[in-house]
Each structure stands twice: as structure tokens, then as C-alpha cells.
């Protein structure tokens, strides 16, 4: 069965094309810095938003028109989604996809039945992977949707829930390895608290660390060679989540001796919910060598929640790819579109249009960022701005030879301090020049 009959294979046609099913800026085989653009960007489709999203919200029922919804049996729907997914990957020519365990197979009446369902669908996906160009960027376990996780998973007050979550992650690690996944993600949507009045914060954080250490050990035991990732988010669905932002996660990893095993999967919306620009989170992760992968989307800044819109802001994508290029590019990570079409964009064709828009936005952003890095636009200014640390008292500070006494003596004998302009407006103007010209 063909699920997307109205959509041809998506091709690159250039910026003057009016074809909604064509790339305008993303030419996957375009060589930049000795490597095809598709290898720089490593795009991935999010299985959950694309194939299981219904369009429901707190005020209304589902709106999405999906051809696989004609089935009633959950396993029949799951099988149809696999067929539709690989047709989608092929037509979009996307190299990767990501999934939660509960995205690909329905939960059964008990853990054994659930794992049996997973086994059936994983076998089906494996067959498709034999002939498909698409690969698994990362897998993960859904430890937030089922009512058992009302108090959390690894941080639950109920040890039975901790045990169930461990069993679920064990299976998710196994199937991610079986499907050739290059990463495994932990996102603690329920790992946090609503009120401190009933929370043993120390025990919860200690238990979260114990859980992650167990995961590390099991990944080693089964020979999983992918990168383990943690995805920060400050809130939603939980009022206060322990993986608040990149700095919080890094401090947690350092405290519990986990920093050598984990990197971060940074999402745009999660950064802004934490009160940061996306580039801030990427920069912090990059300079601490913990930037692993990206969940690409965009937030409506007039709304107070995680809107998961497809990214179309070229300035944002440019500054994001600037950090990725400065890092040396992705290793095992990539750009996963953790984004959903709007509730009113309910036709199956909208899934392609949305992904094309996001892929074009990041392709354009990458090209602009590459020119910025190559020309040293910001590097030259920053080097000049901090040149006082290259010689004299600045060099003494950086080398560790200075102390409070020597610095006081210097300050007493150097009463005149001269600062220079930060030139923010000039730099923003230069950025605009690069954005609006080839």
C-alpha cells in the first residue's frame, strides 16, 4: 500500500522553485568543506510527532488525517506506521529517524506482552532497514506517558516503579542496539517535583544517578557502542525537572561521576523554556565537550509552553550551526526534527512540507555559518577584544602567576582604566549582511 500517493520523491530544485515538494536550499549531495551537506546535517525524522501525533490538545479532539488510522487493532496500526514511515523516509531522502519504544509498538497488559509487541515490530523494522538508506539516529524509552510514572520513573517514590523503568530501559537499549542506533537518549519528563513539601530531593537525585550508572553498565554488557545522551528541559510536564538545562545536567554528571559516559541532546524549545537562547545552551555544551546531538524545532515566544514548531528562523539555525561547526561537526549525533505540524495542518502532505521547510532552514543556516567561521568574522573581533590577556598583567592572570597582592600592586600603579565598545550593533549588522547575501 502507498500511504503518500500525492507526494513525489523530494528533489533539490533551488531557491527559485515554487514546488512545495522540493528543497530550495538543501542539496544533500552539495560538497562543503570536503563533505556532502547531508553528512554535515545528519537529519532525522521524529517517529512520535510524525507517525503517532493526533493533533489533540486540552480543548479539542484529534484532527490529523492519517491513512494508517483506518485500522482498529493497535498492532495493525503499528505495522502500518512502519510501512508508512519507510515510504516517508525514502520520499524525503532523510538519512535517520528516532523513536521511543512506545511509538513503534503499543503497550500490552503486562511487561511480557509489551516486550512481545516490541519484538514483532522491531523484526519488521529490521527487514526494512536491510534495503533502506535510513538508519536509527537514536532510540529511547517513554518513561512519562503511562500513569505508573505519575511520580517519576528513576526518581519515583515507589521502588516498584523504579524497577519497571529499569526493565523498560533495558529492553529499549537492546532494541536500539539491535536496530543499529547510534545514540540512546534519556529525557526525564517526570523526573522532578511539583512541590518540595513531599519530596526527598537528595534520595531522588541519588536514585537517578544509580539508575544511569546501571544503564551505563548494561550498555557495556550488551556491547552497545552508541553515545548515551541526556536531554535537558526545565519544566513540562513536571513543574521543576532535575535536568533543567545544560549547566544543571553537567553539574549532576560531574557530581555523580557520569560525565565520561554522557553527552547532551539539546532542544531549541527546552533552551528557551529555561530562559536561554538556543545558542547559549549549544555554546555551554560545546565548550565543556558535552554537545552530542540536537532536537531541532522552534518555539512561539508569545506562548508559555513547548510548542515544538518546525524551525524556519534562519538567524536561529545559522547561530546553531555556527556552534556545531566550531565543535568540528557532529560525530554520532545529528539534527532530529522533534517538531509537529500545527493542529490545523492535518493533511498527510503537510508532513512533507513541514520537514522540507525545516531542512531548508538548517541547510541555509549551515551555509551562512560556514562562511562566518571561514571568514573568522566573530573570531577576529573576539580575539581583539580579549587581547589584554595575551601580554602584561593579563598574561600573568591567565598563566596563574598573578595573585591578589600582585594585582593590587598593579591596580595601585595603573589608576587609568580604558574600556572599548563591545560593538554589538556592528556585529549584528554584519550577521545580517551574511544572512541576506550569498
UniProtKB/Swiss-Prot annotation:
Residues that, per the record, bind Mg(2+) 1: 231, 267, 295, 338
Protein name (record): Xylose isomerase
Gene Ontology CC, one term: cytoplasm
Lineage per the UniProt record: Bacteria, Bacillati, Bacillota, Clostridia, Thermoanaerobacterales
Top-rank lineage group of the source organism: Bacteria
GO biological process, one term: D-xylose metabolic process
UniProt catalytic activity: alpha-D-xylose = alpha-D-xylulofuranose
InterPro entries in the record: Xyl_isomerase-like_sf, Xyl_isomerase-like_TIM-brl, Xylose_isom_bac, Xylose_isomerase
Active site: 100, 103
Protein source organism: Caldanaerobacter subterraneus subsp. yonseiensis (Thermoanaerobacter yonseiensis)
Amino acid at each position: 500500500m502507498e500511504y503518500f500517493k500525492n507526494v513525489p520523491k523530494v528533489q533539490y530544485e533551488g531557491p527559485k522553485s515554487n514546488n512545495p515538494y522540493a528543497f530550495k536550499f538543501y542539496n544533500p549531495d552539495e560538497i562543503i568543506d570536503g563533505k556532502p551537506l547531508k553528512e554535515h546535517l545528519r537529519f532525522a525524522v521524529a517517529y512520535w510527532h510524525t507517525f503517532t501525533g493526533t493533533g489533540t490538545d486540552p480543548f479539542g479532539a484529534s484532527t490529523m488525517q492519517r491513512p494508517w488510522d483506518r485500522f482498529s487493532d493497535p498492532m495493525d496500526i503499528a505495522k502500518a506506521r512502519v510501512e508508512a514511515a519507510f515510504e516517508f523516509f525514502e520520499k524525503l531522502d532523510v538519512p535517520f529517524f528516532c523513536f521511543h519504544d512506545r511509538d513503534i509498538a503499543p503497550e500490552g497488559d503486562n511487561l511480557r506482552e509489551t516486550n512481545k509487541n516490541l519484538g514483532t515490530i522491531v523484526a519488521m523494522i529490521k527487514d526494512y532497514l536491510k534495503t533502506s538508506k535510513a538508519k536509527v539516529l537514536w532510540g529511547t524509552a517513554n518513561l512519562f506517558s503511562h500513569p505508573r510514572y505519575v511520580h517519576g520513573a528513576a526518581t519515583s517514590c515507589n521502588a516498584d516503579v523504579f524497577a519497571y523503568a529499569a526493565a523498560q530501559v533495558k529492553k529499549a537499549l537492546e532494541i536500539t542496539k539491535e536496530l543499529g542506533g547510534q545514540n540512546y537518549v534519556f529525557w526525564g519528563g517526570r523526573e522532578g517535583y511539583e512541590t518540595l513539601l513531599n519530596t526527598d530531593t537528595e534520595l531522588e537525585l541519588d536514585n537517578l544517578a544509580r539508575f544511569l550508572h546501571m544503564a551505563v553498565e548494561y550498555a557495556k554488557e550488551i556491547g552497545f557502542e552508541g553515545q548515551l545522551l541526556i536531554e535537558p528541559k526545565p519544566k513540562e510536564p513536571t513543574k521543576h525537572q532535575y535536568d533543567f538545562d545544560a549547566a544543571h545536567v553537567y553539574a549532576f554528571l560531574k557530581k555523580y561521576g557520569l560525565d565520561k559516559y554522557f553527552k547532551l541532546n539539546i532542544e531549541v524549545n527546552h533552551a528557551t523554556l529555561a530562559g536561554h537562547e538556543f545558542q547559549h545552551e549549544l555554546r555551554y555544551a560545546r565548550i565543556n565537550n558535552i554537545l552530542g546531538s540536537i532536537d531541532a524545532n522552534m518555539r512561539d515566544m508569545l506562548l508559555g509552553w513547548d510548542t515544538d514548531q518546525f524551525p524556519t528562523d534562519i538567524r536561529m539555525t545559522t547561530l546553531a550551526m555556527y556552534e556545531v561547526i566550531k565543535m568540528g561537526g557532529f560525530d554520532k549525533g545529528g539534527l532530529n526534527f522533534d517538531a509537529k505540524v500545527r493542529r490545523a495542518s492535518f493533511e498527510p502532505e503537510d508532513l512533507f512540507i513541514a520537514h522540507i521547510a525545516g531542512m531548508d532552514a538548517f541547510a541555509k543556516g549551515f551555509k551562512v555559518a560556514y562562511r562566518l567561521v571561514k571568514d573568522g568574522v566573530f573570531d577576529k573581533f573576539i580575539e581583539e577584544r580579549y587581547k589584554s590577556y595575551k601580554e602584561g598583567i593579563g598574561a600573568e592572570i591567565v598563566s596563574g602567576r598573578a595573585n591578589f597582592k600582585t594585582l593590587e600592586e598593579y591596580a595601585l600603579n595603573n589608576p587609568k582604566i580604558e574600556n572599548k565598545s563591545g560593538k554589538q550593533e556592528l556585529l549584528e549588522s554584519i550577521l545580517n549582511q551574511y544572512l541576506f547575501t550569498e
